[in-house]
Amino acid sequence: MDLMKLITVNASIEKPVDMVWEYWTNAHHVTHWNFASPDWHCPSAESNFVEGGEFHYLMAAKDGSFEFDFWGTFQKIEPQKSIEIVLGDQRKMIVLFEKNAEGTKLTEQFEPEQENAEELQQAGWQAILDQFKQYVTS
């Protein structure tokens, strides 16, 4: 995947790669971790997890003030290694699953959007990844 400037977030998770992969790719699990702060949630998640398939995750403020469909298309899937995605706004993203001595290093790299500062985007995506880690390890 040819990527432009990237923002990178990662987490070291003390669980095996197959479990981390399952929790990241299975839409049932996504609703439990795909939010950056306690005042947001992911009330629905649908995913056709095959190359060329799409995912649609509804991201919503719990007070009902705002919601959006975070979606994309899976371009290339290497089971338990990597997932290449083109997001709905045509930005590219790659997710890497690396086995290590502690368990799994999960890395997400994505092209920034132009509306928000890159630091804000990195902080938000890292917060979601931190929620993911907490969900997987609880």
What are these regions (language model features)?
Residues 82-127, 131-132:
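Beta-strand/loop substructures that line and gate deep hydrophobic ligand-binding cavities in soluble
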Residues 16-18, 49-50, 75-80, 96-105:
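A short, structured loop/turn motif at beta-sheet edges
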Residues 6-8, 67-71, 90-94:
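Short, surface-exposed coil-to-beta transition loops
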Residues 3-4, 10-12, 58, 69, ...:
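Charge-dense, helix-prone N-terminal extensions
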Residues 2, 134-138:
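Generic C-terminal helix-cap and adjacent flexible tail
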Residues 41-85:
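Glycine-rich portal/gate segments that line the openings of hydrophobic small-molecule binding cavities
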Residues 20-21, 30, 55-57, 74, ...:
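Hydrophobic pocket/interface hotspot
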Residues 1-40:
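Hydrophobic ligand-binding cavity/cleft-lining segments
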